């Protein structure tokens, strides 16, 4: 159903219909997640399948797709699959399932606080050539909001779930780090959209864009949290 909704969007990205890119990316991401879920597969085989799929799509279109687009799509697809698979790896680590919400909390909180801080206090542009509406004040507000939400998460875990795996001090630093990473992820996907001259990655969420528009920061934050929690 999601693919059908994506196919409705026929605008082009770099000369390639978005539905074609979404089709390749969806399959590639699914295969990547499948590899991480089933350790019997080998990464080299998965990469080869993704590359072959990308080239097959290019050949089918009679050379309309450039080699650089194939490589960008392939790399992006593997990154998306690997990032989302962080949730599977986190769950497999035995950590409390409540922590699976943390990548979303430390991404959406930063985005929300940054929006309102920028709306009320924003004066100095953060990256005008990439995202003209983002401001330094908004960025600082997002980081502060992330720290507050991270501390609130620790309090909730201590109060209702028998204790937190991470203390208040380390969580403050972790939330600050994730806030920076979330903003880098947001700007990175904004840069890609500007590069290809598109406004949104899809229409799944109507006016709010597609999956990547809503979860761009999560893709960057989830692997960071996975790495941090692997040392706990």
Identify the function of each model-found stretch.
Residues 47-58:
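A generic, well-ordered mixed alpha/beta core segment in the N-terminal half of proteins
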Residues 226-232:
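Juxtamembrane boundary at the C-terminal end of a transmembrane helix
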